[in-house]
């Protein structure tokens, strides 16, 4: 895990709230528009990967 990223409070696919650090972060935006930031997280219990929206002020 990269140490430069801060943990985000997300809801895992299992339905639990967890503070996780995204493994990958990218912006999802149509051309010329603001868009949203998406993070790739790994569920600590099941080991499955899932995506979740990040706050707008999150560094990429």
UniProtKB/Swiss-Prot annotation:
Q: How is it modified after translation?
A: Methylated at multiple sites, to varying extents.
Q: Name one GO cellular component term.
A: cytoplasm
Q: Keywords in alphabetical order, please.
A: Chromosome, Cytoplasm, DNA-binding, Methylation
Q: Where in the cell is it found?
A: Chromosome; Cytoplasm
InterPro entries linked to this entry: Cren7_sf, dsDNA-bd_Cren7
Question: Keyword rRNA-binding on this protein?
Answer: no
Give residue numbers for the modification (N6-methyllysine).
16
Q: Which Gene3D superfamilies does the record match to this protein?
A: Chromatin protein Cren7
**MF annotations from Gene Ontology:** double-stranded DNA binding
A Pfam family it matches: Cren7
Which superkingdom, per the lineage? Answer: Archaea
The record's listing under HAMAP family reads: Chromatin_Cren7
Briefly, what is this protein's role? A highly abundant chromatin protein, it binds double-stranded DNA without sequence specificity; there is approximately 1 Cren7 molecule for 10-12 bp of DNA. Constrains negative DNA supercoils. Induces DNA compaction and mediates intermolecular DNA bridging. Binding does not require protein methylation. Binds single-stranded DNA weakly. Increases DNA stability against thermal denaturation. Promotes formation of loose nucleoprotein structures with long DNA in the presence of albA proteins.
Query: Which family, according to UniProt?
Result: Belongs to the Cren7 family.
Quaternary structure annotation from Swiss-Prot or TrEMBL: Monomer.
What name has this protein been given in UniProt?
A: Chromatin protein Cren7
Q: Which organism is it from?
A: Saccharolobus solfataricus (strain ATCC 35092 / DSM 1617 / JCM 11322 / P2)
What's the name of its gene? creN7
């Amino acid at each position: 895990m990269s140490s430069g990223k801060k943990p985000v409070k997300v809801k895992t696919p299992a339905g639990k709230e967890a503070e996780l650090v995204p493994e990958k972060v990218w912006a999802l935006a149509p051309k010329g528009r603001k868009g949203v930031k998406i993070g790739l997280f790994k569920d600590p219990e099941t080991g499955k990967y899932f995506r979740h929206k990040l706050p707008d002020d999150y560094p990429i």
